[in-house]
């Protein structure tokens, strides 16, 4: 009973960048190429993609961007013809990047505020997995001051300190019922913090090619004094007291290699390969401040595996004012079949993107992009909850950014 009631799924947020919970919409230019471009694009978004490239940017700049991530998933239980769909929701990850330093100097500094992890999903209270999850909303905001140095005209290095502020809000039904047959409800919310770093090296050989190597450390987000509230029949109130809880969510590290080559005077080809260290996420432990015979501290097995992603994209210089982009990618899931949960009904996925940048003036650029991700259909039986069925998931994510340069 305890295991059924309180294997609460704080776990991974919705995943829209590489799996698990990453949202790769920090740079709208790169988004238009499915996340490729860490070697090609040298601008203020390099704070995120590769701090070593930041020093090579020609201008100081401030860039503000936002996306509308629309996650739609459907579930059909084994031996049933009824399909249950998530409610339509929009998650708005955002990014703000600013770079500054002397023109043509050997150094440049910057700061980024962005949301690499986050999302929301709402299954409602009537689907077969209501005792697993009703809804989840999670966001991790990274604040990253960065320094970048030019060792030679072609070789740059850089690094940034990352401070994370994360929030979570989730609910699920409880298998205790009132006199009208309505199930109970558990609601958890809280804020956590963590720290990490981002390192990068960027090398280019005139107009022939560029290579990018970058590493983002894992961040252990510690959530303390979260609020746990329970709606149950009055007779069970003492077994489900309103209380506090703590938990720790390890957000994964990643190592990225990017390459770019000019195919001709107008067309560039870029590719990125990313290794993501999800194996750090082995279990999720909840420590409740107040325990009862029913409400005890719990441990939920995750056993995530490391994952890989590959992206390739084209950037076409259509005119002096307009660049057009397209890209595609394939991503391997870190989630093992027996540990698929409703908050991450994940599998390997295909993605495709288009995008543009239009130069409004000497000072302003406008970029836009749209990416679609098709998560492969997955039929699974959860090892702990025994929920068995097939998940189908699509993700749409348009985005826009405005850059001011000086």
What do these predicted ranges mean?
Residues 4-13:
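Sec-dependent N-terminal signal peptides
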Residues 19-31, 76-83, 91-406:
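Outer-membrane beta-barrel porins/channels
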Residues 35-42, 71-90:
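Surface-exposed strand-loop-strand hairpins of Gram-negative outer-membrane beta-barrel proteins
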Residues 4, 39-42, 143, 352:
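Short hydrophobic "helix-edge" motifs at membrane interfaces and signal-peptide entry regions
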Residues 23-37, 55-72:
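Transmembrane beta-strand segments of Gram-negative outer membrane beta-barrel proteins
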Residues 38-60, 99-104, 151:
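Outer-membrane beta-barrel pore proteins
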Residues 14-18:
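Sec/Tat signal peptide C-region and signal peptidase I cleavage site
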